Amino acid sequence: MATAVFKNITPIPDVNTFLDVVLSRTQRKTPTVIRSGFKISRIRGFYGRKVKFTQDTITEKLDSILQEFPKLNDIHPFHADLLNILYDRDHLKIALSQLSTAKHLVENVARDYIRLLKYGDSLYRCKQLKRAALGRMATIIKRQKSSLEFLEQVRQHLSRLPAIDPNTRTLLVCGYPNVGKSSFMNKVTRAQVDVQPYAFTTKSLFVGHFDYKYLRWQVIDTPGILDHPLEQMNTIEMQSITAMAHLRSAVLYFMDLSEMCGYSVAAQVKLYHSIKPLFANKVTILVLNKIDAMRPEDLDQKNQELLQTIIDDGNVKVVQTSCVQDIGVMDVRTTACEALLAARVEQKLKGSRVNNVLNRIHLAEPAARDEVARPACIPDSVKTRRAYDANDPNRRILARDIEAANGGAGVYNVELRDKYILQDPSWKYDRMPELLDGKNVADFVDPEIEAKLLALDEEEERLEREGYYDSDQEIEDADEEEVLEKASRIREKNKLTMLAARQKKIKNRPVLPRTAGIRTLDELQSSLQSAGLPSDSIEERARSRARTAAANEMADGSGVDLLMNEGEEIRSKSIAPRSQSNRRESGVHAEGARSYADRLARVKQIHRNRMARASESDRHVIAAKPKHLLSGKRGNGKTQRR
């Protein structure tokens, strides 16, 4: 359907947005780094790629606009004329042709500058050529400002047009303004057309839908038409003329005999005869509306004669209605639908396609064996059966009556098993067997299992009362008692050791090396004595190791060396340690110079701390542009690192 295509047109951007989209896409989708030291062929290819990519993007955008807009020569004549009335066919074609011309100009500019880039001898000249090419393309697009704005307005209006199918079953409502066309449409369809007591409330085509005989129908409410030449009709009236001229439908011509619409009966009859050529080969229904105010029988002689000129036409059917009091509204709809269905069937029978179908249809009729008539036989019981009456006490009781008597829906549970047809009626209410792996579960269920379980529970309680499960074994061996006592003391000691270790760890102290915690011989002896262990052998072993170390030192040197070493040792012990001056105070003599020096040191450390330097000698240069953050480009499905 063309109207569905109208609603799918992509929004058209203005000039500035168009250029922003194109240039930003070029910047994102093409390389951005080039150096003057690269090969000239690489530089030419770099800028040539940018020019070509920009031209491709502009061409793609303009092509999508040109392809999405409907071609007036290819769509239905109704939609083509409607677009001509609403937007002017020539204006629309000129706007589209200007975009097509701009597309070709952009292609020519890109072709010329790519040829010039092949002769660029430096990065600067190639860059200037690229800049000139993109500038000329942007200038060409900027000149299409008015065309893009006009096409965007047309697109917005097209998307709001009603979805009119020119090939489906259609009822077309027409007539003078304010004769009740929109009121009738609101009655027979789900549309909500604005109805006001003044003329030209409806200024465009409105569509409503309804179902009749399981078929989908559409009703088109047209704006009011005035009786004047076609050249003098405005856009609102021309929409109605276009619909009547091109849509194959049933035309409902509404007349207001009460003249409350502001137009006389004679004017309405004259308008009918003026637009009668548009009703050729169409089903025409004359709808006399507002009969609650004026009926045809109450008209004067002159108006009745004028009305009769329309009725005398053999192709016109007359229906009376009143939308205010809902008189004859459905009759109008039924009459129009039946007439249109018959006309469509008749038209299809006149076509050539029906012969292809009729040749394959054969109606089989039984051959008469004699002259005896054998009509359909209807039993007397069926003929005498009375119609069901809910108020009849002797009526047949239905399932609905049983449900209502037992609480209604949601309360009463319908018993469906009483309708089962089985060999034995007693089987109706048997429970359905539960099958598992092709076997009936009921066959494997012990009916006495609950009684057996109860007997087992009673026996268990009896054994517990008698002390059957109580243990008679007691520990009477003294050795076993001693072992158990030692084991309990060991477990208690391990627990205390673990707690002490935990308390030691939670103290906020630095962890010292193993050598810093060396204990003396006296501490070792005291700990062994407290544990009840001998310590004499430990002391003797320590003294022997000390004597062995001293003898080794004497064996390494001569006696003179030993005497010298002993003299040096005595002399070193007699010399007092040399006093050391505070290095922070050296070189600072004046009062207040210390605080100034500290303040100056802090100032000098600011830069080092900000640059995350370890010290003054830290000269490490970190990466100015981390490659894992700045390398790669996401585009065309290619990804490097990121």
UniProtKB/Swiss-Prot annotation:
Residues 602-611, 625-642 have a biased composition (Basic residues). The modification Phosphoserine is found at S471. GO terms for molecular function: GTP binding; GTPase activity; RNA binding. GTP binds at residues 175-182, 221-225, 289-292. GO terms for biological process: assembly of large subunit precursor of preribosome; ribosomal large subunit biogenesis; ribosomal subunit export from nucleus. One of its GO terms (cellular component) is nucleolus. Belongs to the TRAFAC class OBG-HflX-like GTPase superfamily. OBG GTPase family. NOG subfamily. It is found in: Nucleus, Nucleolus. It comes from Schizosaccharomyces pombe (strain 972 / ATCC 24843) (Fission yeast). This is Probable nucleolar GTP-binding protein 1. Keywords: GTP-binding, Nucleotide-binding, Nucleus, Phosphoprotein, Ribosome biogenesis. Residues 582-601 have a biased composition (Basic and acidic residues). The modification Phosphotyrosine is found at Y468. Gene3D superfamilies: 1.20.120.1190, P-loop containing nucleotide triphosphate hydrolases. InterPro entries: G_OBG, GTP-bd, NOG1, NOG1_N, NOG1_Rossman_fold_dom, NOG_C, P-loop_NTPase. Residues 169-341 form the OBG-type G domain. Involved in the biogenesis of the 60S ribosomal subunit. Residues 571-642 are annotated as: Disordered.
